[in-house]
Amino acid sequence: MKKDIHPKYEEITASCSCGNVMKIRSTVGHDLNLDVCSKCHPFFTGKQRDVATGGRVDRFNKRFNIPGSK
């Protein structure tokens, strides 16, 4: 194996905008500032909302009164 070809793998701090701070290991080489993390992302917190945008199929089913449509 060749020596000194791999990037330096070191511990860095990842700080989220919600205030959560995590120590992780990475080859980035500097601390990270995150917008969202598992503590504040709606998918992980259970505060996500369902977006029912409908669409062309729903509009078609409504227009022609297709059985089984919503």
Curated annotation (Swiss-Prot):
The modification N6-acetyllysine is found at K8. GO terms for biological process: cytoplasmic translation; negative regulation of cytoplasmic translational initiation; translation; translational initiation. It comes from the Bacteria. GO terms for molecular function: rRNA binding; structural constituent of ribosome; zinc ion binding. Binds 1 zinc ion per subunit. Only 1 ligand appears to be Cys, the other are thought to be His and either backbone amides or solvent. Proteolytically cleaved by protease VII to yield a peptide lacking residues 63-70. It is not clear if this is due to protein degradation or is a bona fide processing event in the strain used in PubMed:339950 and PubMed:10556732. In strains B, D10, MRE-600 and Q13 the only protein seen in PubMed:10556732 was full-length; the last 7 amino acids were sequenced only for strain MRE-600. PROSITE patterns: RIBOSOMAL_L31. Zn(2+) binds at C16. Its cofactor is Zn(2+). Keywords: Acetylation, Metal-binding, Ribonucleoprotein, Ribosomal protein, RNA-binding, rRNA-binding, Zinc. Pfam families: Ribosomal_L31 (PF01197). One of its GO terms (cellular component) is cytoplasm. Part of the 50S ribosomal subunit. Belongs to the bacterial ribosomal protein bL31 family. Type A subfamily. Binds the 23S rRNA. This is Large ribosomal subunit protein bL31. The gene is rpmE.
